[in-house]
């Protein structure tokens, strides 16, 4: 028996004969955080809107728990749109109470649930304040609270961190991970590499309405090879050519070159090899003034697959 909550089978969506989603087939598994990663206009939002029944595909099939999605019970889905949708003239508590009553949540249960959600999203002290007085980050958190007040089994988040500062983003991520702890399935669209990498169990990289790759973040990054990027800046850039020639003997080196007067190395287990790199540089009468290491990112994968950066 399949563990897929949502299944797309050769789904196409066209507007004026232009395919914005083109022959998309994938499965979202129960209890996972599933990320759609791609630039704006890639077809991410259209795909999730079809998944939850807000749009009908031009062709293809969409199944929810093995059944045609037209039979979907709206109480099973919580949707957090990219745009903030709140009643500005009501308090935070009143917003959640109103939406909870629409889902027929018993009064006592609803009040208790509102307090828990506000605490989880660090909004307890804003409970009785008008939504219109909240900051942008707080409104984003309220948006997710509204989408999850009825305890849906599937939570859909469209660009949840758009425009947020790092602190608000971290609070939002913690709440998304909490949804997984509750056993819920989370589907999110994002163009932020760190968000997709940090949160997602699996990531679908999508561009021009087509699925390019689908796998775990770790396996996706292995597409461009197992390795780290080391950047060296010497006190005298005229030594770069000499040092590059010396560093070519480092084991597991995949690439080495000069860029912006810095030396760039791509190699396996870079952290373990740092002492050897530093020793080799210093033993050749050069001095390192700056050194950094970073791992391959999902944006590197996107560049490998499309030949361009994610935000282009």
Residue ranges of predicted features:
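Conserved ABC ATPase signature
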Residues: 130-134
